[in-house]
């Protein structure tokens, strides 16, 4: 819906009531929101929440199970941290309770892009950082509105 609103309008801000970020992979969500921000030329507002329905949580991300509220809050905080890193840093890494980026010991194998010490260990070709594409239009990120925390 946001992409449709971006295509049909030129001035209104485009926001979501809340993205339940605990249900999503933070890298995919960061890229999706950044793409919408690019398409709208910086008109995106991001609402984030941790979810309230156990039936959704357990089926979309078992780590978000609301039976353990403390764990759900930690997942929310870590997911938001990854989103902000993905948007604000050219290359980033993250080693948390729920997410580790880049995947440990992943060897760079991409003939179409040159290797760089910005994101890899040049001695053994393992990835040390990753990047999301595109970055948001708004720098460093679209405004974030938290429903919780």
What is each of the regions a protein language model found here?
Residues 25-149:
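Internal, glycine-rich beta/alpha segment that forms the wall or movable "lid"
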Residues 1-14, 139-142:
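N-terminal beta1-alpha1-beta2 module of alpha/beta enzyme domains
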